[in-house]
C-alpha cells in the first residue's frame, strides 16, 4: 500500500484516466484536424508567397527591361539632338559665311564704283583745268577771230576725248 500513498502514483493514474477520456471523446482527432488544418494553411501561405515572389520577379524583370529601353531611347534622343544641333550650327555657319561674302563683295563693288567715280571726277576736273588754262594761254597769244575759232575747236576736241 505504500504505492497508493505516493503522490506521483496518483498523478500517473490521473494522467492515464485523462488520456483515456480524451481517447474516448476523440480529442486526438480534433487535435489532428487542427494540426492538419494549420499545416494546410501554412502550405497555402507558402504557395502564395512563392507565387507572389515569382510575380515580383516578373515585375522586376519587366521594370528592368523598360528601364533599359528608356535609357536606350534617351541615348538615341540625345545623339539625334546633338547631330541636329551640329547640323544647325553648320547651316548657320555656312549662312553667315555666305552673308559675309556677299557683304564683302557688295562693299568691294561700292569701293570700286567710288574709285571709278573719283577717278572720273579727277579726270574731269583736270580736263576742265587744262581747257581753262589752254583757253587763257591761247586767248592771250592769239588775238582776233582766228584765236577764238581755234580755242572753240580745241575745247570741243578736248571735251570729246576726255569724256
Curated annotation (Swiss-Prot):
Pfam families: ATP-synt_B. InterPro entries: AH/BAR_dom_sf (IPR027267), ATP_synth_b/b'su_bac/chlpt (IPR002146), ATP_synthase_B_chain (IPR050059). The chain crosses the membrane at residues 7-27. One of its GO terms (cellular component) is proton-transporting ATP synthase complex. It is a single-pass membrane protein. Signal peptide: none annotated. The keyword Ubl conjugation does not apply. It is found in: Cell inner membrane. GO terms for molecular function: proton-transporting ATP synthase activity, rotational mechanism; proton-transporting ATPase activity, rotational mechanism. Keywords: ATP synthesis, Cell inner membrane, Cell membrane, CF(0), Hydrogen ion transport, Ion transport, Membrane, Transmembrane, Transmembrane helix, Transport. The keyword Transmembrane applies. Belongs to the ATPase B chain family. F-type ATPases have 2 components, F(1) - the catalytic core - and F(0) - the membrane proton channel. F(1) has five subunits: alpha(3), beta(3), gamma(1), delta(1), epsilon(1). F(0) has three main subunits: a(1), b(2) and c(10-14). The alpha and beta chains form an alternating ring which encloses part of the gamma chain. F(1) is attached to F(0) by a central stalk formed by the gamma and epsilon chains, while a peripheral stalk is formed by the delta and b chains. F(1)F(0) ATP synthase produces ATP from ADP in the presence of a proton or sodium gradient. F-type ATPases consist of two structural domains, F(1) containing the extramembraneous catalytic core and F(0) containing the membrane proton channel, linked together by a central stalk and a peripheral stalk. During catalysis, ATP synthesis in the catalytic domain of F(1) is coupled via a rotary mechanism of the central stalk subunits to proton translocation. This is ATP synthase subunit b 1. It comes from Bradyrhizobium sp. (strain BTAi1 / ATCC BAA-1182). The gene is atpF1.
Amino acid at each position: 500500500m505504500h504505492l497508493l500513498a505516493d503522490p506521483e502514483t496518483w498523478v500517473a493514474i490521473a494522467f492515464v484516466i485523462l488520456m483515456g477520456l480524451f481517447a474516448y471523446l476523440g480529442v486526438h482527432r480534433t487535435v489532428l484536424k487542427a494540426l492538419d488544418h494549420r499545416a494546410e494553411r501554412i502550405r497555402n501561405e507558402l504557395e502564395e508567397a512563392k507565387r507572389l515572389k515569382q510575380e515580383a520577379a516578373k515585375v522586376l524583370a519587366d521594370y528592368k527591361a523598360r528601364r533599359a529601353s528608356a535609357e536606350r531611347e534617351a541615348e538615341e534622343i540625345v545623339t539625334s539632338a546633338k547631330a541636329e544641333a551640329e547640323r544647325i550650327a553648320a547651316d548657320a555657319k555656312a549662312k553667315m559665311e555666305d552673308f559675309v561674302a556677299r557683304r564683302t563683295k557688295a562693299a568691294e563693288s561700292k569701293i570700286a564704283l567710288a574709285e571709278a567715280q573719283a577717278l572720273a571726277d579727277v579726270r574731269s576736273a583736270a580736263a576742265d583745268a587744262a581747257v581753262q588754262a589752254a583757253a587763257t594761254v591761247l586767248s592771250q597769244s592769239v588775238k582776233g577771230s582766228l584765236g577764238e575759232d581755234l580755242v572753240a575747236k580745241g575745247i570741243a576736241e578736248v571735251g570729246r576725248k576726255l569724256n
